[in-house]
């Protein structure tokens, strides 16, 4: 079976390193499916999901807040602004962060950092979506 190495790295740490048969991510122009021997490319990633299908057929679900995807003949590298594996997301903390960001944006004052609050909201929504996908997968 043909594989491609996949690395997901954020500013804080390496999130994933391993062999994959398929990597799915959301680029600026839509969803990308990367398989072994894919043509080289570089694209910006939107906040959303990254799904890696491992050699044994397991699907690993990650939530990213955006970044860059680079494909070379033998490796896919995702440089994520932030990334987390769906099965490690703290749902209570994510809901709290989402509510806080929504509260800040609803009560805009002159002293708030709107871009930061919007980014916090996007990250929380992406993580909640990853949790929902994980729950649907586990139920089946």
UniProtKB/Swiss-Prot annotation:
CDD domains: F1-ATPase_delta. Transmembrane segments: none annotated. Pfam families: ATP-synt_DE, ATP-synt_DE_N. GO terms for cellular component: plasma membrane; proton-transporting ATP synthase complex. It is found in: Cell inner membrane. One of its GO terms (molecular function) is proton-transporting ATP synthase activity, rotational mechanism. F-type ATPases have 2 components, CF(1) - the catalytic core - and CF(0) - the membrane proton channel. CF(1) has five subunits: alpha(3), beta(3), gamma(1), delta(1), epsilon(1). CF(0) has three main subunits: a, b and c. Belongs to the ATPase epsilon chain family. This is ATP synthase epsilon chain. It comes from Xylella fastidiosa (strain 9a5c). The gene is atpC.
């Amino acid at each position: 079976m043909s594989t491609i190495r996949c690395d997901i790295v954020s500013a804080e740490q390496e999130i994933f390193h391993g062999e994959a048969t398929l990597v799915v991510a959301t680029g600026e122009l839509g969803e990308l499916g990367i398989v072994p021997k894919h043509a080289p490319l570089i694209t910006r990633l939107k906040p959303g999901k990254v799904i890696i299908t491992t050699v044994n057929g397991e699907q690993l679900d990650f939530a990213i807040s955006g970044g860059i995807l680079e494909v070379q003949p033998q490796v896919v590298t995702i440089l994520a602004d932030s990334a987390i594996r769906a099965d490690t997301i703290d749902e209570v903390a994510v809901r709290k962060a989402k509510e806080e960001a929504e509260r800040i944006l609803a009560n805009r004052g002159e002293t708030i950092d709107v871009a930061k609050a919007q980014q916090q909201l996007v990250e929380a929504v992406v993580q909640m979506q990853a949790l929902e996908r994980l729950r649907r997968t586990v139920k089946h």
